[in-house]
Amino acid sequence: MMMAMAGCVAAAAHAENTTLSDSSKVFDIDEVVVVSQPKEVMRLRQQALSSTSMSSSLMKKMGASDLRDLSLFVPNFVMPNYGSRLSSSVYVRGIGSRVNSPAIGLYLDGIPVMSKSAFNLHNYQLSRVDVLRGPQGTLYGQNTEGGLVKMYSHNPFDYQGSEVKLSYGSKYYRNVEAAHYHKFNNHLALSLAGFYEGEKGFFRNTFTGERSDQYDEAGGKLLLKARFNSGWKIDVLANYQYVDQNGFPYGKLNLETGKADLPASTFPGTYRRNNLISGFKLGYSGRGFDFSSVSSYQYLKDRMLMDQDYLSAPYMRILQEQLQNSFTQELSFKSNRAVGGFWNWTVGGFFSRQWLKTNGPVFFDEAMTTPIGNGIQQQMYSAIHALMVKTMMDKGMPEAAANAAAAAAIEKAGGISMAVSMGAPGVYHTPQTNLGFYHESNFNLTSRLVATLGIRYDLMHTSIHYQSAAFMAMTANMMGQKATFTLKSALDGKAKDDYSQLLPKIGITYQLDDQQSNLYATVSKGYRAGGYNIQMFSDILQTELNAHRQQAMRGDYDVPHTPEDYEKVNQTISYKPEVSWNYEVGAHLNLFDHALHFDLGAFYMKVKNQQLSVMAGNYGFGRMMVNAGKSHSCGIEAALRGQLANGNLDWMLNYGYTRAEFDEYTDGEGDKAVSYKDKKVPYVPEHTLSAMADYRLQLGSSLLRSMVLGANVNMQGKIYWDNANSYGQDIYAVLGAHVAFDLGKVQLNLWGKNLTDTNYNTFAVDNAATGKREYFAQRGNPFQCGVDVSFRF
């Protein structure tokens, strides 16, 4: 890799000696869109890390309205579009998570978004998005092991006026956005923005007849900024969003063809969410240092209902209602000029407290309870029938006659029947407290060489109070005698854990030339917090009910639990923190007098106790997090971005390769143990590729100033859907295009997505609710087209 990097350096040197007639230049986004950075002292492409930045205009060209869309154009960074807004899985360099602790951090206008359930937001009126890949734990703490995403709204001090955007597309897609930016004076500015978006959806449930992916969402945000001559500044912000949608359009997957059917679940999946992110930021720029205080309060209330078996027969449903309140406080200081001409520093502390209450019952329906009742009924009938036959035969009746007579007697007396009802209610309180202290120094060893040293101490306290139960009510009608017996298993327990980590970082950057091209190398530690699985309680309790079913045949029975039982449960539901070491080398090259930016990086990660999301236990009633022993991932990332034709042609090309494999991971015990050593880590694409080109035709007309022709493509694959690598998604590509017209204060944009109507799956899962393993997947969205009309005044 170092030889390849040296070759790139040589090419860069040659390129810089080449003078082109084209005067087009590509600027770092830090030079164009300046935002508050309370911790960093250098621009992104001057730091020892891999990153991708997107401006407002670039996001509009790509048609990106949320992080799922943005991820399509970032190498080795994937947020698949599936499920609902609750689904916020992100996979970066072989690190990822479907549930519980996230693999990346998300900052919205400088506020850390604390709930993973809130990551999948509608993005609008943004000036800039930065995606940092690789562990960012030194400055940003736990759960930034895969990277960090920072989103920034327009600054009303720099951006004034009003905007209205109206959009309409196929499948009854509609969108309305309105925003106003006002600068009262040099000391006070305000922005207000709101949106509504909805869509009929692509996938019709063949059982219910409803669209399984229709949605409506709306929200608003406020940003008030104050600046004072004394060096102080204040920001007050609030961002509220509401979503109401059908979701989880999973259809049966044909493993041979790789194609998924339309969804056919008995119960329509739904998701509703209220989410508020608010913050108060206080800053001061003094002599030699900057001070920043960031306080936030966040509220999330949601409700998910999902058909857990995804079949047209009613087996089971799961309800999940979350109520979360979070508070964060961060204080940071950094130098605003080099001490002694060579030392820049950052120091700070972070505190957060989260309160989360989850109501998560599992409902068992007729397709599951009827076979259980029939099985018990058959056992009862056989036992009574055999006893009657024996009695008759003892009196001298022939066996055949005794069998017939016993059956007739049972039928005449009212027969034997058994009705079973089951449920698994549960309420879980899982508060968390996090405390971190950090320091980072950047030393200018020479005019071109910079060394970075950082360290963070991170402490997490997590606890759980679970009140969970499972019951089986059996109503027996035995030859005219009716009785109901209830078998119940209830757990009411508590557990707690403390985790602490030191998160160091060492980096070095060497500037190659006066164009700010540089080479870098870095070593950093990543960390993802441990915690508790709550969705697996129904599986634990159902296993207990099956083990004690016979006791309920004689009357009501409550399964007893000893302190040893609770200790075993606490060990079963907990999972350990995930820890990784990341080794990375790379280059940020500015070529042809800044007409071309070329970023190249290579990484190797060693992961211990990798957290994986799997279906719980024997029945697959819910997802749970488990720890694999060890894994590793390695790969490369390359990004090219340039301008040609006097700035009229914008283009970019991104490629990422990740090879993520298990080194130690054995699931199960004894004869049932399965080793996944050398298997690929699931849900991680091996290749990611994206490209975009926009050509502007300057028309010079007073009515039509210019026209833009643009096209983009993104590619992913191969992706495995399980630890055994038994099935997956082959590599696929999705093509998009748009034509934009500049009419002065009016902008018109015609767009199309998935122009070739590529058939692919964004997610797949299996379960054994029916007693045999079934496979399901969600299709990627098919062809769609539409139009945007924007007004600015």
Predicted regions and their residues:
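Short acidic/polar hinge/loop motifs at secondary-structure boundaries
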Residues: 109-135
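Gram-negative outer-membrane beta-barrel transporters
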Residues: 334-335, 346-352, 447-451, 593-607, ...
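N-terminal periplasmic "start-of-domain" segments of outer-membrane beta-barrel proteins
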Residues: 26-60, 87-89, 157
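Transmembrane beta-barrel wall of Gram-negative outer-membrane proteins
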Residues: 161-163, 168-199, 203, 207-245, ...
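Solvent-exposed loop segments that connect transmembrane elements
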Residues: 204-210, 248-264, 309-316, 363-425, ...
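N-terminal periplasmic accessory domains that precede
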Residues: 67-70, 90-94, 107, 143-165, ...
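Membrane-embedded beta-barrel scaffold of Gram-negative outer-membrane proteins
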Residues: 281-286, 290-306, 518-522, 535, ...
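C-terminal beta-signal and adjacent terminal beta-strands/loops
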Residues: 356, 369, 527, 647, ...
